[in-house]
């Protein structure tokens, strides 16, 4: 392949949800609401955990605060571009912007997978080894596990990105069935045989998501099996239910997209909305609605701030 041919394509056209202006205007309002909800919900959890002494010292809530930060970052990788594209007929993205988006999508996404696995281990220790919980899940270990999650995401994303940028792109340049740059649809546009690359990438992304999901489900199953009393099992199920809901909402779509041979389907676009937009929006609701301690801390935060504002007014 001639070098000039491989450098012809320096931009991609993303697939939108509609070409009808009135429909796109409605979708813009809907996704703007989703994105604002993501910011409000996740920032509120981070502020609540940081301002409450009990929550801030608890390993579970320390990890929850980090999960909220990852959710915020994850949605920000794709949603602002999506909102802007509702006003752009061509929905254009440069090659460099595409690679950057792809890198951070897999960086933050993989880090969140690893962190959810860490949170499952935290619940296992808390429920099955309660007497050793504070010793095992020390703040130092929590920081190491969070850092390891970020590092794991970075390594995973670096591998995916390096494999992608070494491919020649000379046309076509229409990224099918997605509103952002992701590995499966982008490498389909390469002017080369990508079979081996696809196997490597499926092994990378597919195995990470599938193995993490299996480990998570196994952890929660072990928790329920080890508890003998009905009351203890009921409490454990109540505690784990929110985690299981988050895990299913996030891992289900990811496994569907990444743990298969690289072929695109029309449903991929809607599946991508689930783990890029809907899950980060629902996570704060799932964790706060079922958690009395978080709700109580939020109420204290509102009361404290309300009293502060009243003092400032007087």
Swiss-Prot record:
- Which parts of the chain does the record assign to the membrane side Cytoplasmic? 48-61, 120-142, 218-236, 290-314
Give the subcellular location.
Cell membrane
Please give, as recorded in its UniProt entry, the membrane topology of this protein.
Answer: Multi-pass membrane protein
The protein's matches in Pfam families, at most eight in alphabetical order, are given as: 7tm_4
Q: Which residues lie on this side of the membrane: Extracellular?
A: 1-26, 85-98, 164-196, 258-268
GO molecular-function terms, A-Z: G protein-coupled receptor activity; olfactory receptor activity
The source's domain of life comes to Eukaryota
Family the entry assigns: Belongs to the G-protein coupled receptor 1 family.
Q: What does this protein do?
A: Odorant receptor.
- This one is known as Olfactory receptor 4Q2
Which organism was this protein described from? Homo sapiens
């Amino acid at each position: 392949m001639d070098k000039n041919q491989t450098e012809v394509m320096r931009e991609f056209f993303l697939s939108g949800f509609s070409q009808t202006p009135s429909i796109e205007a409605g979708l813009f309002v809907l996704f703007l609401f989703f994105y604002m909800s993501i910011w409000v919900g996740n920032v509120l959890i981070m502020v609540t955990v940081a301002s409450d002494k009990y929550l801030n010292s608890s390993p579970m809530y320390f990890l929850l605060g980090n999960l909220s930060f990852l959710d915020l970052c994850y949605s920000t990788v794709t949603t602002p571009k999506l909102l802007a594209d509702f006003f752009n007929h061509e929905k254009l993205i440069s090659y460099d912007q595409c690679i950057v988006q792809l890198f951070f999508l897999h960086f933050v996404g993989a880090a969140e997978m690893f962190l959810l696995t860490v949170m499952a281990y935290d619940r296992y220790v808390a429920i099955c080894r309660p007497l050793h919980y504070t010793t095992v899940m020390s703040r130092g270990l929590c920081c190491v596990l969070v850092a390891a999650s970020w590092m794991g995401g970075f390594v995973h994303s670096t591998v995916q990105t390096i494999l992608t940028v070494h491919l020649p792109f000379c046309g076509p340049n229409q990224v099918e069935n997605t509103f952002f740059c992701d590995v499966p649809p982008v490498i389909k546009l390469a002017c080369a045989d990508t079979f081996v690359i696809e196997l490597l990438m499926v092994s990378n992304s597919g195995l990470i998501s599938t193995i993490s999901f299996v480990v998570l489900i196994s952890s929660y199953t072990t928790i329920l099996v080890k508890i003998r009393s009905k009351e203890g099992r009921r409490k454990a199920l109540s505690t784990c239910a929110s985690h299981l809901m988050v895990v299913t909402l996030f891992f289900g779509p990811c496994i569907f997209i990444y743990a298969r041979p690289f072929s695109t389907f029309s449903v991929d676009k809607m599946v991508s909305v689930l783990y890029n937009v809907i899950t980060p929006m629902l996570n704060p609701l799932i964790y706060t609605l079922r958690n009395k301690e978080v709700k109580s801390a939020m109420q204290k935060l509102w009361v404290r701030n309300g009293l502060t504002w009243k003092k400032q007014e007087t």
